[in-house]
Amino acid sequence: MLTCKKLVLLPVFALTLSGCASEPTDPQFVASKSLQPYMQDDYQTYLADTQEWLLENRVFLTNDKQTELSAVAPFELVPQNPNGQGVLLVHGLGDSPFSYVDIAPDLAAQGYLVRVILLPGHGTRAADLSLPEIEDWQNIVAHHYELLNEQVEGVWLGGFSTGANLVTALAYQHPEVKGLLLFSPAFKPRDSLARFSPLASWFVDWESQLPEDNYTRYNSLHMKGAATYYKSSAVVRDYIDDAAYDKPTFVMLSEADETIDSQYAVEQFSEKFTSSHSELLWFGETQYKDERITSYSMNLPNQKIVSASHISLVFSPENPIYKRDGEVRLCFREQPEGTPKDCSEVPSDQVWFSAYGDGEETQVRARISWNPYFDQSMQKMNRFLKDNKN
């Protein structure tokens, strides 16, 4: 059976499609029958139900189902010495709770009850990003904020990329939220053509279809998912445009971010995130007059690092998947002549790491997927939280 489509448009990431495409046969590209339930009355039931859902609906990439489930399932960390407050963390588009595998334990060690949710459409198969509407993502974040708020005496909201959009919009609606932790906030996409993605999603199924070989996230992107992300960015920009946010906010941004407009985000931080206690860590070379902004140079030739990427800020240099010599290496498409087709065959100490597109074409290059300043970043975050706990 053929699915016929005709579209000449450049949405999201410079896509042009015209003609007919075959119905997918790879189960990664065939959606589940429905979304997982997410409005349970309590968090423990949500965890159990989601584990069962993932086991039944996930297209597993390896024979080690437990490792894969542990990577993508929502989780809770209960602190040994509770401080009375909690943190709700929300991942980004195509990602999973694994985005917080390094950050969440640090928060729990500071006494916070930490909960990480799984956005509907994630953790199972790439085609499931065709299923959720923006309301599903908004509703799950709002619902689990309410559940956590019943258990603690104050909630911080944290978000990576698209997750940052969702939690920021919710924080505007709930002035009782203690504050925000934002990692690579995707307030505005770097590609201005992303605004066409909601229209394109009516005609085009996939922004990109790639082999799925990373069990922590999707490599492929369904156009409906791209459109839903864009809607989340439009919503949060409306809130930011309409009013300042005066609660303490901690932000981490890469100057070279290849996915989002980080310059827009830093400008909004200076203009609209007005608390004198707010803080932004800028991973790049620009120095800002705003005293709340600390810059960390990413020109690190001794480490063969050129710049920070969209995903790198949240992962430790010791992360087994994303460290320099980790299980996953995100190779650039263009490599010097003679480079193996899979650049992961090149010893890690011979590879230069950066945001996509950065670096010298004469060098073997890969997307950086860890934060060389991770320990310093966590120290800054912990100090920020301690100073703003009350």
Spans of features found by a protein language model:
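Short, surface-exposed "cap/lid" segments of acyl-processing enzymes
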Residues: 69-122
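Serine-hydrolase catalytic core
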Residues: 76-81, 221-362, 366-386
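Gly/Ala-rich beta-loop-alpha elbow adjacent to hydrolase catalytic centers
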Residues: 158-163, 167
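Active-site nucleophile loop of the alpha/beta-hydrolase fold
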Residues: 181-192
